[in-house]
C-alpha cells in the first residue's frame, strides 16, 4: 500500500513527539503526508516548516491563514506568508477559506483574507488548500472572481451540488474520516458522484478520527480507514483507491514520490 495523507496538522502540540507517529504511518502503508501549517500568531508557520525539513522524504508543508484567525492577521503577516510560500518546499497556499459554522472571525474579514490568499496562490502558481464550512456559495464565488483553478477542498463535507461546482472549477475533493460516520448520506452520495480521479484522502489529524477510531486523537496512519470506506462507496478495491488518490496528491502538490 502506498497512501498519501493529503492534510494533517502534525505541527500542533498534540504531537509533541512526531517520531512514533511517523513510524506508525509508515507501518500502515503511508509514503507521504501534507503537513498544513496554520497561523495563530507570529512564528506559528515555523513549526510546520521545521518538521517538514526534518523529514523531507515523508512530509511536505503548506502554509496559510485559517478563517478562524482572519481577523488577527496583519499586513506584516500577509507579507511573511507570501515570502514564505514562495519557497520551493512549500507545496501550496492554505488552508484558507470561509467558516460560517463557527464564525470565529467576522465574515468580512474571512472573505478579505481568503481572497488575498486566492490571489497569492494564482500569483505563485501554486495550489490552494481550501477550508469551507456552511459557506459553499460564497467560497465558490470568490474562487470564480479570482480565477483559481488549481486546488483542493480539504475535508469536503458538502452535497452533490457543491461537489459539482468545485469539480467544474478543476478542484480536487479531499475526504476525511467524516465519510465513515453515520448519518452522512448526502456526503456519501457526493462521493459516489465525484470521479475517483478527482479525490484524495486525508486525516486532518489530530481531528476527525475515522471509525473505528472515532473519539480518539487522529493520526496519519488512520487514513487507511478512510481509504477503505472510499473503496466501498466507489465499488472498487482498496488497491485502486490507493493508487488513484496517491497519484492525485502527487499531481496537485508536485510530489516526487518514491
Regions found by a protein language model. Name each.
Residues 1-258:
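Mid-domain alpha/beta scaffold segments of enzyme catalytic cores
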Amino acid at each position: 500500500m502506498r497512501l498519501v495523507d493529503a492534510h494533517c496538522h502534525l505541527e500542533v502540540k498534540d504531537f509533541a513527539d512526531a517520531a512514533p507517529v511517523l513510524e506508525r504511518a509508515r507501518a500502515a502503508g503511508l509514503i507521504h503526508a501534507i503537513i498544513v501549517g496554520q497561523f495563530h500568531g507570529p512564528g506559528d508557520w515555523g513549526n510546520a516548516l521545521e518538521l517538514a525539513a526534518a523529514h523531507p522524504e515523508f512530509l511536505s508543508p503548506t502554509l496559510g491563514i485559517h478563517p478562524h484567525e482572519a481577523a488577527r492577521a496583519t499586513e506584516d503577516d500577509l507579507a511573511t506568508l507570501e515570502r514564505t510560500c514562495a519557497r520551493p518546499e512549500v507545496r501550496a497556499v492554505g488552508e484558507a477559506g470561509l467558516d460560517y459554522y463557527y464564525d470565529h472571525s467576522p465574515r468580512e474579514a474571512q472573505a478579505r483574507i481568503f481572497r488575498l490568499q486566492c490571489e497569492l496562490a494564482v500569483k505563485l502558481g501554486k495550489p490552494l488548500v481550501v477550508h469551507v464550512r456552511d459557506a459553499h456559495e460564497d467560497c465558490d464565488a470568490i474562487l470564480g472572481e479570482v480565477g483559481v483553478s488549481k486546488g483542493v477542498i480539504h475535508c469536503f463535507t458538502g452535497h452533490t451540488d457543491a461537489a459539482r461546482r468545485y469539480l467544474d472549477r478543476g478542484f480536487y475533493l479531499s475526504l476525511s474520516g467524516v465519510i465513515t460516520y453515520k448519518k452522512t448520506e448526502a456526503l456519501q452520495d457526493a462521493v459516489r458522484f465525484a470521479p475517483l480521479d478527482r479525490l484524495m484522502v486525508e486525516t486532518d489529524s489530530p481531528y476527525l478520527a475515522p471509525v473505528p477510531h472515532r473519539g480518539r486523537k487522529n493520526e496519519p496512519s488512520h487514513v487507511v480507514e478512510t481509504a477503505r470506506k472510499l473503496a466501498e462507496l466507489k465499488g472498487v478495491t482498496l488497491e485502486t483507491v490507493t493508487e488513484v488518490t496517491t497519484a492525485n496528491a502527487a499531481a496537485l502538490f508536485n510530489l516526487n514520490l518514491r
